[in-house]
């Protein structure tokens, strides 16, 4: 019974260790699937709108942008519960608060863009900051998006230090020239990174992001401990972006190896541990009372052979 409990404890410990290591990767993949499902519904609802309905969305967004005198942003990650107006939340609202989609091919990122609200804060979602321009596909826009780097798990997994989605974690690896794509309804807006910097929360608040005449800017902000990573980009023509994306596709090596390592290594270690446990179990076979082991049977066979080969020796022993 003790041997059985030992094996059971080893199996449970192995499962716990494997789960600890692969939980973030599995959770991230499930999060990506949820985001893909959200965007699939978004595209369906976009396709269901006629041309007039789509144009009206952009006109509403442009009216919002015209009402902005200056583009600044508070630190939306520490500002507590942020309430936004119903008027803001109704603009560009195609599906359940989703404005569009952020795509960064260089880091394999694709995320829905939500309206900033109490239900969708910047600490949990990639959001549009309501003090900036909405993506109206026009000139003089300065769009600000904000979201977490790594989404902390909720409940007990979060208390254990486990994470859920890897959202804007890889923004650090971007360089000037990296392309960023915004898909809003049936329109595509492409931006090229011009600068990446790390700021304090106070420094971020002091930044004046108001666009100049004819400028079209995109800013993405993500927290890094007590600092704020800020990526700034300028809009470029879609035709130019297609050429650059084609060049990136030819030069980019697949980055799925990260997931292979995160999933493959724990599985391989688990397999080795299971094989070790099986060998231990095979070496300690449980037998019923009176049941002979294989080793005992082999010993008896060897003794019988020796008896047949030396019968005189046995008789001498018996006479003594």
Residue ranges and their predicted role:
Residues 3-263, 279-291:
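Solvent-exposed, non-transmembrane regions of membrane-associated and secreted proteins
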Residues 266-267:
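Contiguous transmembrane helix-bundle modules in multi-pass membrane proteins
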Residues 285-320:
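Cytoplasmic C-terminal tails of single-pass
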